[in-house]
Amino acid sequence: MNTLMQLFIFIGTMTLVFSCVPDVKKDSVVLMSDSQRGETLVAECMLCHSNKEAQRGPILHGMEMWYLMDQLEKFRSGVRGKLASNRSEYLMGVGARKIKDDFELAYVANWFSEQDPLPAIRTVQGSLEEGKKYFNQRCASCHGGNGEGNRLLNAPSLQRLEGWYFLEQMRKFRSGERGYHSQDIGGQAMAAASQEISDRNLRNVVAYCVDAFGPEEELSNRDRLAPNKSVKPF
């Protein structure tokens, strides 16, 4: 089956899925607003998912609620995070299974989606010109010209992704460490789309996305402490 046919099937499937998804956002907030359980869950997430933590997970602040719920459910159910070789996702799977039910899952997703986006250090370098060209040719049709995403296509926004995490996930899609499960429809589509992308093009695309519409740049400790970089070659 060619990629175009897979995409048409994927679009039809996701349209049906989202038409049946209940609106749990309001109920989840009401049910958990008077307890400390929600705050405890968020605090545990923040041990890894902020820009100040010791265990470095991706920043989730400001991401779309629907996408966070989708990925959390995949981790909780084992659609993601079952490969021990993929250590970061394996650990995330362990953490996600602490979420007891759909209301707790929705509370966590809602909390992160309502936070202001955090700045991020830019670590991926590449050709912005080549990256823009490749993005418009291969990525914009699903993720939007400004990386805003498209829920009907199950294509998340790219505007909150840190460069290092963005590049890491694209490599995992390409290698089969992500998008391997038969129930991960969106992941399988991305895995198929990334098979022929070279590492150079991956870096160019990520560098362009982060520069054009990614998180606000945060200076590294080195740049803050030594803003005037040495011109010496050593």
Where are the model-predicted features located?
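Axial heme c-ligation environment in periplasmic c-type cytochrome domains
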Residues: A54-H61, R76-A106, Q115, A120-G126, ...
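The feature marks the first
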Residues: D34-S77
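The canonical Cys-X-X-Cys-His
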Residues: G38, V42-K52, V108, G131, ...
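Short microdomains enriched in Cys/His and/or Lys/Arg
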Residues: M65-R76, R160-K172, F234
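Electrostatic cytochrome c docking/interface patches
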Residues: V21-L41, E53-R56, N110-F135, G214, ...
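Extended amphipathic alpha-helical interaction segments
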Residues: A120-R151, A155-R160
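Bacterial N-terminal signal peptides that target proteins for export
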Residues: M1-F8
